[in-house]
Amino acid sequence: MPNFSHKSQARQYSFERKIARNSAEFAKISEPYSSVVEETRTDKLVDTSSVHHVFLQKTGPCVEYKRHVEIPVDTSADATEETQWSLDIPWFGWIFRPLISRHIKHRHHKNRHPWWAPPQTFTAHETLVLALLAAASMVAAFINTLFTQTVAFAADEFGVSTTGQGVAAAIVRLGIVLAIPLAILGDRIGRQRVVIALAFIAPVLASLGALAPNFAALVGTQTIARPVGLALDVAVLVILIEEMPKHGRAYGLSVLALASGFGAGFAVAALPIADLGPTAWRFVYVLALIWLAVALSLRRRLTETPRFVAHRSEPKGSRRDTSRKTGITAPRTLLMVGAVAFLVNIFVATASIFQNRYLKDVRDYSATMVALFTLSTSTPAALGLIIGGKIADINGRRRVAALCIPLGAVLISLSF
C-alpha cells in the first residue's frame, strides 16, 4: 500500500454538473471513466425518486476520489453528477493540478488520454514520487549548469583566457569520477538516504564558489559540487525506474527533463545579476542555497523504494543479490548506452561551455541578453519533452533516440 503518512498536503476539489437526458453523455453516465482516473463502481442505490451510482478511484493520481451520479426517476429531469477529489503534487502542482482538474470537469467516455497524461495511469503514490524526484532534478540541473553559465564572467574578473576556461571546464567535468562511488552508495544504504543527503550537500558545496579568491579555487569548489549534483541525478533516475510503471518510465524521464530545464533555467535567469559589476557573478552561486528548501521537502516526504526494500531481504549470494551489488545485469546494453552518452557529451559539453563566451564576445551580448537568448530558445523544448516521452513509451525508446540525437546535433551545430 502507498505510504501517505509523510505529511500529505493534498488539496481538495469538487465539481457538480447537470447532464441532459438527450445528450450523448447521458447514455454512458452510469459507466466508469478510464482516462487519467480509472474508476470502479461500488454501489447502485434506488429510492423512490432517483437511481444513485457511486464510483471510486481504482487507479489514478488522486489521493481521494468519489463520483456520485443521481438519475431522477422523472424522465423530464436531468441527471446530476458530483465529483470530489484531492491531489497531492508538491512543487509542480501549479502545472498538473489545473490540467487534471480541467480534465475531470470536461471529460467524456471516449477513453482517450489527454496529450499531457502518461500512456499508463499513475497512482497517487507514483504521482507524488515523480513530483519529488522532479524537484530533486531541478537541484541537480542548477548545480550542473552553474559553472557553465558563469565561467565567462568569472574569467573576466580573474583574467583567464579562453584556453584556460576550456581547461577549467575539462577539470570540472573530470570530477565525474567522484560521482561514481556516491551513486553506488544507493545500492548499499538505500536510494532515499542518498538522494536526501546529496540534495543537502550539493547546494552548500556549489555556494562556496561565491567565496573563491581566485579562478583555481572556483574550479576546485565546482569540481566537487558538480559530481555531487550528477550523483543526485543518477540516484533520482534509479528511483524513477524502480517506482514508475513499465509504460510510464519514458514519460517520467521527460518530466524529469522538463524539471531539469526549470533548474537550469533558474541559473540562466539569474545571470543578469552578473551585469551589476565585475564580481557580481558570485551572487549567482549564493542562490544555490535556495535549493535547500527542496532537500527539506525530500527529507519529509520521500520514502524508500519497495524494490530496494525487497532486494535488501534477498538471500546473500543469490543471483538478484549479486546483480544488485555489482550493478551488472545486461553488460552489452550498459556498454551501448554508456557509449552513446559519452559521444553525446563530447559534443554537448563543448558546445555548452563556450556558448556564453561566443554570445558575449562574438555577438557582444550582455549577461541579460545571454539569459534572454538561452531562455527563449530552451523554453519551447518543454512541450517537446512531454510529447517525446509519451511517444517513446508508445513507439519505443530506440526510435526516438535514433531520430533525436543526430537531429539535435545538427541543429546545435548550425546555431554557431
Predicted segments with their positions:
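Glycine-rich segments within core transmembrane alpha-helices of 12-TM secondary carriers
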Residues: G248-P272, W291
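Central cavity-lining transmembrane alpha-helices of secondary-active solute carriers
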Residues: A169-I184, L237, L375-G388
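Helix-breaking motifs and short loop linkers at transmembrane-helix boundaries and internal kinks
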Residues: G159, G190, L211-A217, P245, ...
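Extracytoplasmic
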Residues: V129-T162, V348-N356
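Structural signature of the two symmetry-related core transmembrane helices
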Residues: R193-L208, R399-L414
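Extracytoplasmic gate region of multi-pass secondary transporters
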Residues: F147-A152, P331-A382
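Helix-loop junctions at membrane interfaces in 12-TM secondary transporters
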Residues: A210-T221, G277-P278, F416
